[in-house]
Amino acid sequence: MNGFETVDNIEAYNNLAEAIVTLACEDYRSYRKQLRKATSRLEMEQLAREKHDVELNIRLLNSKILEIEKFLSSPYGMMLSHQLGDVILEKLRNE
């Protein structure tokens, strides 16, 4: 067993995965809603900056997903990947 294989770490990775999905969905929905409401050029410029921030957030979240995938590709993680994958897929379906 290595440090990644404790119950607390598995639970933490599961919580992180759920938070990543939730945050990415909320950021994107918020951006799209504001974009529809934008009426002036200044609002559009501000939204373009916010879109850039959202894109940066998504890149950061993607790097966290890669960390999770690395863990899940470990021998111990592979045993858990189906269970965690099901949780993540269910969360995505519900969003």
Write out the residue ranges for each language-model feature.
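N-terminal accessory regions of S-adenosyl-L-methionine
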Residues: 36, 43-52
